[in-house]
């Protein structure tokens, strides 16, 4: 159990009522970050990974090749 996390229900380990997420690169203060927020920067401009606003995960930019990851 993670009772120290204010976003986490200590019994279920899921987000508390009214909260979106517990942790992740696109989660801050128990809420999903806004769509378009950079969650992983790359050396190449325009190929950063961005939050979607609906998940706490940081999805891979579909325009990046495997070598650029």
UniProtKB/Swiss-Prot annotation:
Residues 1-66 form the Disintegrin domain. It is found in: Secreted. SMART domains: DISIN. Disulfide bonds join 7-30, 21-27, 26-51, 39-58. Pfam families: Disintegrin. SUPFAM superfamilies: Blood coagulation inhibitor (disintegrin). One of its GO terms (molecular function) is toxin activity. It comes from the Eukaryota. Keywords: Cell adhesion impairing toxin, Disulfide bond, Hemostasis impairing toxin, Platelet aggregation inhibiting toxin, Secreted, Toxin. GO terms for cellular component: extracellular region. Expressed by the venom gland. The keyword Secreted applies. InterPro entries: Disintegrin_CS, Disintegrin_dom, Disintegrin_dom_sf. Signal peptide: none annotated. Transmembrane segments: none annotated. A motif (Cell attachment site) lies at residues 43-45. Belongs to the disintegrin family. Dimeric disintegrin subfamily. Negative results: does not inhibit alpha-1/beta-1 (ITGA1/ITGB1), alpha-2/beta-1 (ITGA2/ITGB1) and alpha-6/beta-1 (ITGA6/ITGB1). Heterodimer with VLO5A; disulfide-linked. Poor inhibitor of platelet aggregation. The disintegrin inhibits the adhesion of the alpha-4/beta-1 (ITGA4/ITGB1) integrin to VCAM-1. Inhibition on alpha-2b/beta-3 (ITGA2B/ITGB3) is low. This is Disintegrin VLO5B.
